[in-house]
Amino acid sequence: MAIELGERISTSVGFLAELFLMKIPLFTVIVALLTIILGIVNIFLPIVDFFGLSWHNLINIRLHTLNTYPLVHHGVISFILGLLGIFLLMPRFERRYGTLCTIAMFFGFLEVIPAIAYLIACYVAESDDVYVGIGGWVYSLLAMYLLNLFGDLHPKLLNLPQVVRMALALVAPVLGLPLDFSITIVLHLTAVVISIIFSFAYMDFFLPRGGFLVWVETKFSKIIDAIPNYISVTEAAYYQADGAIPIQDLGSNSSGIV
């Protein structure tokens, strides 16, 4: 009985591992793996202060924290919720924009601008709180989902008036205040506002040019072709049809809200 149960568990784990490595897009897998690895390391080493976002780290010129703070978490609950958010929300976004563009966006303006807003708030409030966690990314993705960037996800919800969907996106971070009533609300709200502006195609200048992305993918095609579940610019354009990176321009979000 125990042997049979062990075999079933082993088969299930093997199936989940295969699904994880072969079905989920590359950037999503990398972020999830880094989150898991750093979560384990955090049990034994105090890495939150080194990777977390704080005014103290900025003064000490630890600029890497502008990019690393989503990958570490304070506790088990935030760790689990962060992973859940990544698996539920990130894959569709990556398929829509491609792996390279997704990396550029989530380690670029979608992450850095909210981080800067948080640091300014910390300076004004004379706070040295350390912010870690993937909450900013999750709220960004939720806002873009609500604003029809992914119109086939929840058609009933997306039939609501646009103003209502914008209000829902802005209210989402506020609902988390009872769990964490702190200055982090500034980062979360900034992430939502930036995502709303991006959804209306007013931040196209932050997107890497499609021609450059194609050049990079062509230059390193031998390496890229060997990487499982890498989403190329061409595949992203095909997936979204007339979405954020049109085939004829490969660098524009001109369609805005689908």
Swiss-Prot record:
Endpoints of the signal sequence: none
Active site: 188
Superkingdom classification of source: Eukaryota
Membrane-crossing residue ranges in chain numbering: 24-44, 70-90, 100-120, 130-150, 157-177, 181-201
Keyword Transport listed: no
Membrane topology, record value: Multi-pass membrane protein
Principal subcellular localisation of the protein: Golgi
Compartments where found: Golgi apparatus membrane
GO MF annotations, alphabetized: serine-type endopeptidase activity
Gene Ontology biological process terms in this record: proteolysis
EC number: 3.4.21.-
A GO term from the CC aspect: Golgi apparatus
Keywords assigned by UniProt, alphabetized: Golgi apparatus, Hydrolase, Membrane, Protease, Serine protease, Transmembrane, Transmembrane helix
Family recorded in the similarity comment: Belongs to the peptidase S54 family.
Protein name: Uncharacterized rhomboid protein C19B12.06c
Organism of derivation: Schizosaccharomyces pombe (strain 972 / ATCC 24843) (Fission yeast)
Lineage of the organism: Eukaryota, Fungi, Dikarya, Ascomycota, Taphrinomycotina
